[in-house]
Regions:
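Solvent-exposed interaction patches of small proteins and small membrane subunits
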Residues: 1-125
């Protein structure tokens, strides 16, 4: 339980940094790239929090971000719409790690407010 609280605190701090950059009203390419970087580390903190939560509260051992989303859905912590968005978020996170394209960066940046809202709703922010 204590480990979940620690991870949740890290995830909430990471989310706050993402929300800070998303609040900018006239984002530049540099701000867009900063937001994507903040999304990457926020995502890592969040999925690891979910993984630990499922292990400690539900006895489920999941080894991947998609497994974590599926586990949270199966145990009722996410509804179908949230799980679908969560899986899309995993896919977008994977794309940010393996490719760079101006168009793709713009598309992912447009999705970040939805992802931040989903993360915030699940982490108590």
């Amino acid at each position: 339980m204590e480990r979940v609280k620690e991870r949740l605190g890290v995830a909430q701090k990471a989310l706050a940094t993402l929300q800070e950059v998303l609040a900018e009203t006239n984002p530049t390419v540099i701000l867009r790239d900063a937001a994507i970087q903040r999304f990457e580390y926020t995502f890592e903190a969040v999925w690891k929090t979910g993984q630990e939560f499922l292990r400690s509260h539900e006895g489920l051992d999941v080894g991947s971000p998609k497994g974590t989303v599926h586990g949270l859905f199966q145990t009722g912590y996410l509804n179908a719409r949230q799980a679908e968005l969560g899986l899309k978020m995993v896919d977008d996170r994977n794309l940010t790690s393996h490719t760079y394209s101006e168009g793709l960066s713009g598309q992912i940046f447009e999705e970040l407010p939805k992802y931040a809202t989903l993360i915030g709703n699940q982490s108590g922010q």
